[in-house]
Regions:
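Conserved phosphate/ATP/ADP-binding segment of small-molecule kinases
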Residues: 4-102
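Conserved post-catalytic alpha-helical subdomain immediately downstream of the catalytic base
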Residues: 78-83, 108-172
Length: 174
């Protein structure tokens, strides 16, 4: 679920998603239209939460908390979720799971031209890995690859496909 906070996803829809989803991945975004009113804590449970640092700060109510403390302690206390990813921009991402300690996965972007859609690409690429039981390192790695590809595209001029992700991963692993 990419929840942009424009009112499309009502509390009753969230309740239904939490009750009926086989796997629920959530990115509740803060933006200029909803800033402060579309927190991930609207979702009482999820299988994977993926949000950026400002969104996490709003959700835990702390302007200065360290990213690893947010992802490994404060967010798990605020939402019933076994896996949480906090995207850190140039810093990559911090991952946490009940079965794993907090880990950092580096960013892979070489050129940044536009940030629009990077979090959406991250979630779209990483959620399937989480759904089939991937490790947090694997989930964060694939998500960061997708995010790196997306920040190299202005707006929505083109999309990211499987071939681009596979090619990028192959290049990184050489």
């Amino acid at each position: 679920v990419n929840d942009f906070g424009h009112g499309l996803i009502a509390p009753s829809t969230i309740e239904l998603l939490c009750r009926r989803s086989k796997f629920l991945a959530v990115n509740a975004q803060s933006n200029s239209a909803n800033f402060g009113f579309n927190l991930v804590t609207r979702y009482p449970c999820a299988d994977l939460v993926c949000i950026d640092t400002p969104e996490a700060r709003l959700a835990v109510g702390s302007k200065f908390m360290d990213a690893s403390e947010m992802v490994g302690r404060a967010l798990p206390a605020a939402i019933n979720c076994d896996r949480i990813i906090l995207t850190l921009g140039r810093g990559g991402c911090s991952t946490w799971a009940k079965a794993e300690d907090v880990q950092t996965v580096p960013a892979f972007a070489k050129t940044v031209v536009d940030l629009v859609g990077a979090g959406d690409a991250f979630l779209a690429a990483s959620a399937p890995i989480a759904a089939v039981g991937g490790t947090m390192q694997q989930i964060g790695f694939v998500g960061n690859v997708a995010g790196a590809l997306k920040v190299g595209i202005v707006g929505h001029r083109s999309s990211i496909d499987r071939a681009a992700i596979v090619k990028s991963i192959s290049g990184l692993l050489k």
